[in-house]
Structure formats: C-alpha cells, structure tokens
Amino acid sequence: MERVDVVYALILDETEEKILMVQNIKHDNWSMPGGAVEAGETLTEAVIREAREETGLTIEAGDILAVNEAFMERFNHHTIFFTFMARVVGGEILIQDTETIADTAWMSIDEADKWMPYHKTGIRSLLEKAVPYTFQGVEKY
C-alpha cells in the first residue's frame, strides 16, 4: 500500500460556535477543508494551501487536534489524516478549486459532527486538547 498523508483545517468561528465546512463534489459529502500533502510540502504548508484552494481564506495552522488512520483498500492507500486547529488571518470565502468543491458553509458543531463520524468523541472533545506540531527542518547526514 502507498502511504498518503492528508491534512484538514478545523476553522472555528468561536463567537458563533460554527465550523467552516466544504461540500465535496466527488463524494457528495461535507468535510473540513483539506486534502493530500504534496511532495516537498510540510503538513502546515499543505493545510494552508488546501484551505486557500477550497475556501479562498488564508489561515494560520495551529496545533494538531487529531490523527486518524485508515487503509483505503479501493485506492491501495495507507492514509494518515492530520487535523489542525486553524485561524483565519485573511481573505474572503471564494472557492478556487471549483472542480472538487461545490460550496462552503458555516455549520454548528453538532451538525458538522454528523458528517465526521470518524471523530468518535465528537469535535468538542477535539477542541479540549491539542498536540504541538513542529517542522524540525531538513536533516543532512
């Protein structure tokens, strides 16, 4: 199986307690903005790029809120999913990746939970704890 890293941005509007979600055309579902890490990208570079492509927003990636893993047999992928806390620092909602994203919506945490059953304890529990992420640079031996 090929290893694939995928990143997601949990963009929270704290005043409204809503999460920004994107509607995926291919699977006709909703998810947090995100996608596969490209060669040569760090996880944070990837989550910033994916959020910009899918929402038009510039984000700052925070700590990791969740790490999930799956064997996607139909694609022959061993996928690791990294969910980052994210904060909007600029831009306006404008989908750039119109081939894969149909719409965006601010959803209540409870509504967003329905689209993400793989976070078994729910999104609220993710917001209670985090793991710092640090890119250590390039090691040359």
Regions found by a protein language model. Name each.
Residues 28-30, 99-141:
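Nudix hydrolase/Nudix homology domain
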Residues 15-17, 27-28, 38, 67-70, ...:
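Short, charged/polar surface micro-motifs in flexible loops or helix N-caps
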Residues 17-53, 141:
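Conserved Nudix-box catalytic region and its N-terminal flanking loop in Nudix hydrolases
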Residues 58-66:
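A short coil-to-beta-strand element that immediately follows conserved catalytic motifs
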Residues 1-19, 36, 85:
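Conserved N-terminal beta-strand and adjoining loop/helix that marks the start
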Residues 70-93, 105, 126-127:
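Active-site-adjacent beta-strand/loop module that shapes the phosphate/pyrophosphate-binding cleft
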